[in-house]
């Protein structure tokens, strides 16, 4: 028989709070979860992410290893 009283209390409607606002509910062992970032305000998921690559990785590699001027035959 399983022991009683050894498992934490389960909250099926735990509130996820970001910047003082309830953004979703999930199941958890805590009644409230406070987060700094969630999918609703993360730049990757909102599409506001801007990739700034002033020098391409391939160009940087070619310059670093001296392969910039010669082409393979």
From Swiss-Prot:
SUPFAM superfamilies: L28p-like. GO terms for cellular component: ribonucleoprotein complex; ribosome. InterPro entries: Ribosomal_bL28/bL31-like_sf (IPR034704), Ribosomal_bL31 (IPR002150), Ribosomal_bL31_A (IPR027491), Ribosomal_bL31_sf (IPR042105). It comes from Synechococcus sp. (strain JA-3-3Ab) (Cyanobacteria bacterium Yellowstone A-Prime). The keyword Ribosomal protein applies. GO terms for biological process: translation. Belongs to the bacterial ribosomal protein bL31 family. Type A subfamily. PROSITE patterns: RIBOSOMAL_L31. Part of the 50S ribosomal subunit. Binds the 23S rRNA. PANTHER family: 50S RIBOSOMAL PROTEIN L31, CHLOROPLASTIC, LARGE RIBOSOMAL SUBUNIT PROTEIN BL31C. Keywords: Ribonucleoprotein, Ribosomal protein, RNA-binding, rRNA-binding. GO terms for molecular function: rRNA binding; structural constituent of ribosome. This is Large ribosomal subunit protein bL31.
């Amino acid at each position: 028989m399983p022991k009683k009283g050894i498992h934490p209390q389960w909250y099926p409607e735990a509130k996820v709070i970001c910047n003082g606002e309830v953004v979703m509910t999930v199941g958890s062992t805590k009644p409230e979860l406070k987060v700094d970032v969630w999918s609703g305000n993360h730049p990757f998921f909102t599409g506001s992410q801007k990739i700034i690559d002033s020098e391409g990785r391939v160009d940087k590699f070619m310059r670093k290893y001296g392969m910039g001027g010669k082409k393979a035959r």
